[in-house]
Structure formats: structure tokens, C-alpha cells
Amino acid sequence: MGDFNDTPSDKSIIHGIKTMSYPSDTTSAHSLYNLFSNSEQLAKPGSHKYQGEWAQLDQIIVTGTLLDSRNPMHLIPGSNRLFTPQFLFKTDKTYHGTRPFRTYYGYKYEGGYSDHLPLLVDFSLPLAP
């Protein structure tokens, strides 16, 4: 999980890490699945904005085991999303629209959070006995 500095469709993600698309019709316990591979539908506007362009540079990659609902701990289908509350954004005076409310904008301290938006995913966990 984290900032890969590449989009889900980049060769480094697909061929380098060998990720599969999610959701997938079939899953294998030994394969890796990028929960943000279908970012056009999942992650609007994207997790990072650079020179006016949003891109999904942050990924959560899991094994097929976490996609199997028969396992005690598993991903809740459809729970992968960007966290986009209004307080994480600031007006983008240069490129218009909004941008993440960053801690620093160049050398200027803004007091924000990050230049990337957070990713969220929900897991089902077994109850303790």
C-alpha cells in the first residue's frame, strides 16, 4: 500500500509487480490484485494532482487470499475508495478546481495534510472468542 508514483496501468505495476485487475471474475490465492486498477470508476478525481492533472499514483495491492470471503479475514467487496472529505482540499488558484491541502506547497508551509489523498478499504475480521 502506498505511493508507487505510477498509475495502475503503468508497466511497472502490471508487469513489474505482476498485478491483476480488481474486481476479477476469478481469483488465485497466489496472485496480486490492485484494488485501484479500475481507478477511472473508483478513485475520482485521483489521489494526486500535478500541474493541474489528477492521477491515481497510490495503490493498495493484496493477495487473492484477502479477496476470498471464505477466509476469516477478507476484503469487503466494493469497499476500496478514496477518502475525500472537503477539509482535505484547497482551491487551486493556478490550475483551477481543487487540489489536496498540503503541508507544504513548494517552500511555503500551508498547514495541510498531504499532497496525496488517503485510500481506504474495509476488511471483515473474525470476532475474538
Regions found by a protein language model. Give the residues of each.
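Active-site flanking residues adjacent to catalytic metal/cofactor-binding acidic residues
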Residues: M1-D3
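Metal-dependent phosphoester-hydrolase catalytic domains
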Residues: N5-P129
